[in-house]
UniProtKB/Swiss-Prot annotation:
Binds 1 zinc ion per subunit. A motif ('KMSKS' region) lies at residues 285-289. It comes from Rhodopseudomonas palustris (strain TIE-1). This is Cysteine--tRNA ligase. Belongs to the class-I aminoacyl-tRNA synthetase family. Gene3D superfamilies: Anticodon-binding domain of a subclass of class I aminoacyl-tRNA synthetases, HUPs. One of its GO terms (biological process) is cysteinyl-tRNA aminoacylation. Its EC number is 6.1.1.16. Keywords: Aminoacyl-tRNA synthetase, ATP-binding, Cytoplasm, Ligase, Metal-binding, Nucleotide-binding, Protein biosynthesis, Zinc. Monomer. The gene is cysS.
Length: 491
């Protein structure tokens, strides 16, 4: 089946042809580990996890290499470490911040059903590669040293007259437009407003390494050089796919292209550039000042959003309901809809436990192969779910034949959910089962109190919330005539 992907550089959807089908290579920009990941950060993680799964499905698990970096050297990390651990030496405080944040990031994305990348390199483990690229750029006349800084010159790149890509081509901006949009105050060590930092001197106490290009003062890398170095180390000078959020197109990805292409004298850093759209919350831009800033952890473990916590499958399905290139409005209504859909799938798979290993249906793979159209793929899931729960063909048939057809559809639904990374937990582990049961009992207790106070509105709300989880309540009385509520999973 032909995979077609939208390329940000060429601005069209075209067939994806890997450089080497036996070694398909993808790089995605990962987190800067200074704070817990918010729901906007979750979108590229989920989107490119689905692409990783699809590539493995099409080319074989052993033939796909996915690299997602960890940025563990950055001004924001330094600031957070100094704030949170004022009594510690800065380097020790930085280690605490980065280790804690990276651990929380992994817990969060694991809960969202994401596979770990093939390689997850840290920036601080690739300083040697960064220095090597910088040395190449200085030697080639694309970078210069000024006041213990090393800076890249886009003007020098564009002077190559077609031998290299034009700086600004990924973002579709001219150099003049970028100069006009630059801030009035240009750092004194820059020759031009568009020049950007590859390396800078470290202040006393800050992380530092021996500097490149003959600079005596120890320093540290700029942000953009980190990804060029890590992608080069693990994927080579040119690779198949580079992904990230739309906010990274300029300047980060534009600068990556400049560094890598000029250092290695290539026309393309990546064959295909993919970017997911923005996320807003209830129709507004997410920001702490508006009070709608929410982390993945808060969604999973608190009642901050919508008055309840949400499971990872619900969050993932809600994210995938919108095509990755479109903006997404993160709303309570959308999560409730996703939760109901997960509950429907769960009930179906509970009915058909066990099952057989079957191929993912053509309709699901076809949808995903059309520029990762997860919205269309979910429509296919809904159709499979309906087939598993009713007769959709005409003509006389035996009950056994009908049940067999239902079971096949359920098996195909299970395989499709697995490809999309959506775990509906049809067979919960003991620990998860205990948490699930405890949560239900807690809600029943709250509902019982509401009924005792004749708060029928609250009682109905909790009943509906449990119904969305696939739980059916039965109200009755015990042997002493006291009200009692029992529950079971819907069938």
């Amino acid at each position: 089946m032909e995979l077609r992907l939208y390329d940000t550089l060429t601005r069209d959807k075209r067939p994806f042809t890997p450089i080497d089908p036996a070694n398909v290579r993808m790089y995605v920009c990962g987190p800067t580990v200074y704070d817990f990941a918010h729901i906007g950060n979750a979108r590229p993680v989920i989107v490119f996890d689905v692409l990783f799964r699809l590539l493995r499905h099409l080319y074989g698990e052993a033939h796909v290499k996915y690299v997602r970096n960890i940025t563990d050297v950055d001004d924001k990390i330094n600031d957070r470490a100094a704030r949170d651990y004022p009594g510690l030496p800065l380097n020790e405080a930085i280690r605490k911040v980065t280790e804690q944040t990276e651990r929380q990031f992994h817990d969060d994305v694991d809960a969202l059903g994401c596979l770990r990348p093939t390689v997850e390199p840290r920036a601080t483990e690739h300083i040697g590669e960064m220095r090597s690229i910088i040395e190449k750029l200085v030697a080639g006349g694309f970078a210069y040293v000024e006041q213990d800084h090393v800076l890249f010159s886009p003007s020098a790149m564009n002077a190559a007259n077609g031998v290299l890509p034009r700086y600004g081509s990924l973002a579709n901006r001219s150099l003049d437009e970028m100069i006009a949009g630059a801030r009035v105050d240009v750092a004194p060590y820059k020759r031009d407003a568009t020049d950007f930092v590859l390396w800078k001197p470290s202040k006393p106490g800050e992380p530092s390494w021996p500097s490149p290009a003959g600079i005596a003062t120890p320093g540290r890398p700029g942000w953009h050089i980190e990804c060029s170095a890590m992608s080069w180390k693990h994927l080579g000078e040119t690779f198949d796919i580079h992904g990230g959020g739309i906010d990274l197109v300029f300047p980060h990805h534009e600068n990556e292209v400049a560094q890598s292409c000029c250092a290695f004298h290539t026309k393309r850093m990546a064959q295909t550039w993919m970017h997911n759209g923005f996320l807003q919350v209830e129709g507004e831009k997410m920001s702490k000042s508006l009070g709608n800033f929410i982390t993945i952890r808060e969604l999973l473990a608190t009642n901050k959003f919508g008055g309840r916590s949400w499971d990872g499958a619900t969050l993932r399905l809600a994210m995938l309901k919108t095509h990755y290139r479109q903006p997404i409005d993160w709303t309570v209504d959308a999560l409730e809809e996703a939760q109901k859909r997960v509950a429907k799938y769960r009930r179906t798979l509970e009915r058909f436990r066990g099952g057989k290993n079957v191929e993912v249906p053509h309709g699901v793979v076809s949808a995903l192969s059309d520029d990762l159209n997860t919205h269309a793929a979910i429509t296919e899931l809904d159709a499979l779910n309906r087939r598993a729960n009713g007769v959709t063909h005409e003509g006389p048939t035996s009950e056994a034949d009908a049940l067999a057809a239902n079971a096949i559809a359920a098996d195909e639904l299970r395989a499709s959910l697995r490809l999309l990374g959506i775990s509906v937990a049809s067979e919960r582990s003991g620990a998860v089962n205990q948490i699930f049961d405890q949560n239900i009992q807690r809600l029943i207790a709250v509902r019982t109190a509401a009924r005792a106070n004749k708060d029928w509105k609250e009682s109905d709300r909790i009943r509906d919330e449990l119904a969305a989880m696939g739980v059916v309540l039965k109200d009755g009385k015990d042997a002493d005539g006291k009200p009692v509520t029992t529950w079971e999973l819907a069938r």
